[in-house]
């Protein structure tokens, strides 16, 4: 089941990337992020109350101070900053290129785990990490030449910011989950993120035109929340406890290849790119080496 969960994460991430990519092009990024957290809170709460049998008061008293601290940090780095920059990168560079950040996130997370979680790394694992990071950075630099010609820097710094924020989020989540039920850990991250996002959203809300009025937008956001915010997050935690972290990360490194096939041959949103495929394969090889 752990392997199925890992591939489920890949599938649900693809659905989430396209769903939130569509939403990010319809309204402000802040609106999409706060809707994601709001829908996530509403969807998970009944599951906590009626499936996990956790009382409403227990939702806030069951977590320890350490749970709140680390999951709160994960909320800030992930659901607030990470999601914001990821949506910006999707809007500026497209869904296919956004998926290529995944191996770099994995590589940086391994580096952070060495310093923050005291994980051991052999020389060949460091070589794999550097191979993955250098490949993605080189790809971003190549893309930067295109962006610089158009005086567009958002696609560059948003990609780098996404890698950094999501990597720290993973470390904070690992340290913050503890003995909490997976759904409760996800809900707490969403709750803290919603509290952090609400003041700037209210401040920026000048008129009702800020929120799209078509039902398709909200339906797609809802699908994205089910797929990525809840489904992928839950299966990620589940698979982390049922298969080795190395196997899971190797499976996750195939995300850009799946995205390439879907983006080019199914949705036909972008043209075939041998350079992208080479970068994706080399980055995946680097992650595989780092996880041996």
Residues covered by each model-derived region:
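A helix-boundary/kink motif common to multi-pass secondary transporters
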Residues: 28-29, 94-95, 117, 121, ...
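Membrane-interface interhelical linkers
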Residues: 1-31, 35-73, 83-93, 141-160, ...
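MFS transmembrane alpha-helix packing/gate-lining sites
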Residues: 12, 78, 104-105, 165, ...
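Alpha-helical transmembrane segments of compact multi-pass small-molecule transporters, enriched
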Residues: 39-43, 101-115, 192-196, 232, ...
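Hydrophobic alpha-helical transmembrane segments in multi-pass integral membrane proteins
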Residues: 44-55, 108-121, 164-179, 227-241, ...
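Hydrophobic transmembrane alpha-helices of multi-pass small-molecule transport proteins
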Residues: 44, 111-114, 124-143, 274-292
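Juxtamembrane helix-start motifs in multi-pass secondary transporters
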Residues: 32-33, 98, 185-186, 248
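Hydrophobic core positions of alpha-helical segments in small-molecule transporters
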Residues: 8, 35-36, 101-104, 124-127, ...
